[in-house]
Each structure stands twice: as structure tokens, then as C-alpha cells.
Amino acid sequence: MNSYFSLSASQQRTLITQTAVRLGLPEQAVEKDLWVSIILQLVFTLPFSDKLVFKGGTSLSKSFGLIERFSEDIDLVVDRSFFDLHGDLTKKQIKGLRKKSSLFVRDDLTNLLKAAMVSYGLDEYCSVVPEDDGEGDHTYPEPRKIDVYYRTLFPLNEYLQPRVMLEIGARSLFEPTVNTSIQSLVTTQFPQIDTGLVSAHSIATAAPQKTFLEKTFLLHELFTSQRGISAERKSRHLYDLEKMMDVPFAIQAIEDDHLWGTIAHHREVFTSLSGVDYTPDIRDRIVLCPPEEVRSVWERDYSDMQQSMIYGASLPFDALLERISLLEKKFHDR
């Protein structure tokens, strides 16, 4: 097996271009996926990796192959037991957790990631930049982002910047998880090319049924508290749900009272939004489709995603909403 990093820049460019042609994706998307894969593997070699869980939409594609949109960022959760906090927390404790987590990401995680980059010779390709502190109540952003800027081989694409964003927080629900492994799109198309720098590591990953229910909860919160005014990069949740809704784990998750109750309780305690009533069972009245007055904005965002991020089949927007309406009804009628 040949290492991607033993190839010349010209050979790397050709390899990414051939992968992009096979998958019907922009070259910049394939290149970004490669760096997402490398950085994710690298993070799970760090000393505290046993306290991390990989979650979100990128896990659905990279770990489970449930969706066919390329990976853009890396969402991670730190087990709050790492900060000696357990169970339900008071508002004061949650505020303290946010500060501890934010400082940990800004200082410890960033410095260890930089050191790992140097150790594996990636510092000549990448730079690691943590999110700046804010002001006032937002001095310590949580989750806090880390941007990894990589040296691109291709012309700049406005929608696909040469940057991998890690978003790391400690308030998300940590379990249930499963162990997975990941590989880049380049390696899936050219198995003889190894794009990893580290040995295959088991990556603790949020179980897909949890991600499925959390995405439904997120859309309900968006459409009931904010009326879905901001659609930028959010239509992916509609796409993800449509892709998962007929898979057995999703069908079972809709009726899983225990898992739903755990997620609902956790969101109410740790990440509640004003304007959302968490008390009765939200499944009875869940809203998953954008309101009519903002539907065109969501359609534009979905069109952008189809062109730049999806490498498999995807429905027209109207057909997508028909399917999501059906999913909404399944929750109501369970």
C-alpha cells in the first residue's frame, strides 16, 4: 500500500481529481474529506481520547455510511466526568462546566493537537487556530471551535473553504455510543492508497439512533423558537433525516420512550432554548418542516448543498418535504 503523503503534489492532485470524478463531487470536497479523516484519526490518538465521542452528521457518513454527503466538520463531545462533574447539574455548575470545557479546548486540546501535527509532519501542511475568547457572557464560547487550515491543491471554492472545523463541547449527551473506524473517500475509491498517518484507531461514536432523534429535536427547536429564520447550512438535517427514516434503527427510535426521554431531559437541563416547551412529550406535536414564510430560504440552502456536498442521489426539495411530513406524522401517530 502506498502512502498518500509519499506522493508528489501533482500525484496527490490527480488522485483527488479522479476520486472526485468517480463520486461526482467537487475536487475541493474530496480534499476536505481527506483532511477531516486525517484530523479525526489524529484527535483519537491524543491522551484524553477515551473521554471523547464523535457525533453529528459527519459521523453518519464517515462511521456508518448512512448518508451520502461529504464530511465538512468534526463534532466532538467531552465527557463531563473529565471535569469531575456527573449527572444533572445546577445552572451554576453548568456555567462552570462551560468555562472549564472552553478553556480546555482553547489551551490543552489545541496544544496537544499542534504537537501531534508536528510529530506526524503535518505542520508543514496545516495550521491550528482555536476560536478567540468573546466578551461578557460569551467570554468562554462553548462549544468552542478549532479551525485547522490546510494547504489546498485546488482553486478556492467559496462554499468549500480549505479548513476543517472542530467543534468541541461538554454539554451534549455522551451515551449511547459504539466503536467505529473511518477512512477517506480517496481510500474508498483507491484502496491501494493509504491516506492515514496513524494506525487504525477505534473511534467512540454516537449511536445513530441518538443522532437521528437529536436531529429531529434540533429542527423542532429551530422551527418553534426561531421560526427557522436562519437556514444557512441547516437543510442538511432534513436530508439526513430523510435518508435515515426508513432504516430499522430509526423506526425503532421513534417509539423508544427511554431514549427519547433521556434526550429530552438532557436538552431541557443543558441546552434548552427559550420559547420551547420541554414538559409534555414533544413527539406529539413535533414540527420538522420549515414554515411557509421561510421555505424558499431553506430550499436555496438545500440547492447549495446538493451542488457542493451530496455525492449520491437526493430528492427535489418538494419531494424531500413530503417525506419529512411523513416522518412528522410517524412521530405524531406512534
Give short role names for the model-derived ranges.
Residues 54-58:
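Glycine-rich beta-strand-to-loop/alpha-helix junction loops that act as flexible
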Residues 1-52, 64-68, 74, 80-334:
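Structured mid-to-C-terminal alpha-helical surface segments
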Residues 61:
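Betabetaalpha-Me/HNH-type nuclease active-site subdomain
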